[in-house]
Structure formats: structure tokens, C-alpha cells
Swiss-Prot record:
Keyword vocabulary terms for this entry: Metal-binding, Ribonucleoprotein, Ribosomal protein, RNA-binding, rRNA-binding, Zinc
Protein name in the entry: Small ribosomal subunit protein uS14
Taxonomic superkingdom: Archaea
Positions annotated to bind Zn(2+): 33, 36, 51, 54
Amino acid sequence: MLKQSGHKHGKLLKILKHNKPKERKFGKGARRCERCGRYDGIIRRYGLYLCKDCFKEVAHELGFFKWGE
């Protein structure tokens, strides 16, 4: 991106301003995993906001356990 702006600070700011992602209010794009930043498989119950993989790693520390085992 610096090559495109020609190392000019004003041009770099303009490029960053017009290419930043839109802030989402609804849908999958509005929610991210708080640990890794993924958008897929978010567990929102109890206000966790963790993806399924991160939840599986920290579930026991949070007090969740599997009934069968």
C-alpha cells in the first residue's frame, strides 16, 4: 500500500479511509470470537461470544462439562 501512495502521508490516509471495512450492526459479520476473531460458529449463549473451537478449549475452565464422561 505504501508503493501506491508514493510514501505521501495524505494519500496513505485517504487510501485507509476509503478501504476500511463497513461496521456491521446485524448478522454474522457483526459478531466475532473474542479469542481468535473468527466469524463462524459463534456461541452467544450466556454472553460467551466464543467460536466453537475456542469454546471447546476453555469450556472446562469456564465450568462446563460433558455429561457422558
